UniProtKB/Swiss-Prot annotation:
Protein name: Peptide chain release factor 3
Keyword Chloroplast set for record: no
UniProt function note: Increases the formation of ribosomal termination complexes and stimulates activities of RF-1 and RF-2. It binds guanine nucleotides and has strong preference for UGA stop codons. It may interact directly with the ribosome. The stimulation of RF-1 and RF-2 is significantly reduced by GTP and GDP, but not by GMP.
Native organism: Gloeobacter violaceus (strain ATCC 29082 / PCC 7421)
GO biological processes: regulation of translational termination; translational termination
Keywords: Cytoplasm, GTP-binding, Nucleotide-binding, Protein biosynthesis
Top-level taxon in the UniProt lineage: Bacteria
UniProt cross-references to NCBIfam families, sorted A to Z: prfC, PRK00741.1, small_GTP
Taxonomic path: Bacteria, Bacillati, Cyanobacteriota, Cyanophyceae, Gloeobacterales
Gene Ontology cellular-component terms listed: cytosol
Gene giving rise to this polypeptide: prfC
Keyword Magnesium: no
Location of the protein in the cell: Cytoplasm
Binding site for GTP: 20-27, 88-92, 142-145
Length: 531
């Protein structure tokens, strides 16, 4: 393949993740982006989803029962000749690890904000991750059809709390019950929307210039006068639109709308494919890897077991970073040093799947994984390389997981191992091998519920969960191996090992950790497992 052809394919890719606090409307926005992208012909509302229809991105049984997203899902579709790779992330804060891994595979982020609530805790945390990665952030302020805070107040909060400049690409016309549409500041056009039943179909829209008499008639005089005044204010005091600052993550384009009613969704999607970053370079141990480099490379950012209940297989999600992926290609697996044939490669759309013949930088490919891959693994052609690893979040909740049925222990251990490998939970073990019950370590309590639910539904194993009083963990390293044999133990601590045999110590309080670290200055204490 010639470089111009490769560059053209890469230039068509737009890969992004949606970040938000729970209940900001992320699942609804995802569905509406798919609706306007032509990937589905009817959007399923949350209310309908609880009865018959399930959101396209929510495929796991527990997600369908509870109406929440607890895993990241890949949704791919073509819109206006652009290949869109939409990485739908968990909305629940207990699953921030999965979201972090997904953001490692994204080139852009869409930050979703509830107009009534503004910046919330999870939004801020995930924004900080995006900022650390330096990726562009596009903001969609949702639920303008409900009572909410003033738009100027919301913009001010984004600037002050998140420390990023804002440029409202469009501006709401009305609020709550009077929300009619938006003014597009870049195109200088008014977009007035009509509601559809349940928001299942695209919203009819009337478009015209702000000075068009027809548009003035459709808006009442008070609304028209207010929108003209607010636009003049924005033009006079706001920062200018600068695509380079957007690409650097220093300026966020802001869009107003209502995902439930389809107001402003297409304007957001159109602007996104116009301004979003294309796949960029990636840092590896051999240097910077260009997306248009001839040799294929990619990394595993997610592993999901039992996506297909009929086959009980495991899928490794690979973000393509350079070159061209081809079905049945044999690649170098950097961690093991072995050659691996990628014979079963899939394009995924929620639970649906089809064979992938080729893919380019920015694309996400699913590969049936018989246990070869782990999260963070690099695969490549040409000179061996390794991309930067994906760290874990420090766990804050711990519990012993027991198997009450000895005859099911093999199945129990298989399930726990596979769920650990896909990042559903961290698993620790007693140093005394006679104590076989694993200790689960999680960022949030809901992770425990998911593990138990999946062990029962997918592996047919019943479990007993016993919460533990520990609140923090530290991985221990030392310059000299013998130093690990001469630890001065603090009485209120517990020494364990992780799946790779590395020493981990649990503490009940930060004070206990402080005592332990002061007693052992020759040791290094790490919040997360060293890469």
């Amino acid at each position: 393949m010639s470089n111009p052809t490769l560059a053209a394919e890469v230039g068509r890719r737009r890969t992004f993740a949606i970040i938000s606090h729970p209940d900001a409307g992320k699942t609804t926005l995802t569905e509406k982006l798919l609706l306007y992208g032509g990937a589905i012909d009817m959007a399923g509302s949350v209310r309908a989803r609880r009865n018959q229809r399930h959101a396209t991105s929510d495929w796991m049984a527990m997600e369908q029962q509870r109406g929440i997203s607890i895993t990241s899902t890949v949704l791919q579709f073509v819109y206006r000749d652009c290949q869109i790779n939409l990485l739908d992330t968990p909305g629940h804060q207990d699953f921030s690890e999965d979201t972090y891994r997904t953001l490692a595979a994204a080139d852009n982020a869409a930050m979703l904000i509830d107009a009534a609530k503004g910046i919330e805790a999870q939004t801020r945390k995930l924004f900080d991750v995006c900022r650390m990665r330096g990726i562009p952030i596009f903001t969609f302020i949702n639920k303008l059809d409900r009572p909410g805070r003033e738009p100027l107040e919301l913009l001010d909060e984004i600037e002050k709390v998140l420390g990023i400049d804002v440029y409202p690409v469009n501006w709401p016309i009305g609020m709550g019950d009077t929300f009619r549409g938006v003014f597009d500041r870049l195109e200088h056009t008014v977009h007035l929307f009509d509601r559809t039943t349940g928001g299942k179909k695209m919203a009819p829209v009337t478009v015209g210039a702000i000075g068009d008499e027809r548009m003035r008639v459709l808006m009442d005089e008070g609304t028209y006068a207010q929108i003209v005044e607010e636009i003049e204010l924005l033009d006079g005091v706001g920062v200018p639109f600068d695509i380079e600052r957007v690409a650097q993550g220093k300026l966020t384009p802001v869009f107003f709308g209502s995902a439930a009613n389809n107001f402003g969704v297409q304007l957001f999607l159109d602007a996104f494919i116009r301004f979003a970053s294309r796949p960029g370079t990636r840092s590896a141990n051999t240097g910077v890897i260009s997306p248009v480099a001839e040799d294929f490379s990619g990394f595993v950012f997610k592993i999901q077991a039992n996506m297909d209940p009929q086959h009980r297989d495991r899928v490794a999600f690979i973000r393509v970073c350079s070159g061209k992926f081809e079905k049945d290609m044999t690649v170098h697996h950097t961690r093991s040093g072995k050659k691996v044939r990628l014979s079963r490669s899939l394009k995924l759309f929620g639970q649906e799947r089809e064979t992938v013949e080729e893919a380019y930088a920015g694309d996400i490919v699913g590969v049936i994984n018989p246990g070869t891959f782990a999260i963070g693994d690099t695969i490549c052609l040409g000179k061996p390389l390794a991309f930067e690893g994906i760290p874990l979040f420090p766990p804050e909740h711990f519990a012993t997981l027991r198997n009450p049925n000895p005859s099911k222990y093999k199945q129990f251990l298989k399930g726990v191992t596979q769920l650990r490998e896909e990042g559903a939970v961290q698993v620790l073990f007693h140093q005394d091998e006679a104590k076989r019950d694993p200790i689960l370590a999680a960022v949030g309590q809901l992770q425990f519920d998911v593990v138990r639910f999946r062990l029962e539904s997918e592996y047919h194993v019943e479990t007993i969960l016993e919460p533990l009083p520990w609140t923090l963990a530290r991985w221990i390293t030392a310059k000299q191996l013998e130093d690990l044999e001469t630890i001065d133990w603090y009485f209120d601590s517990l020494g364990l090992k992780d799946h790779e045999g590395r020493l981990v110590i649990l503490f009940k309080t930060p004070w206990g950790f402080q005592q332990m670290s002061e007693r052992n200055p020759h040791l290094q204490f790490h919040e997360i497992a060293p890469l």
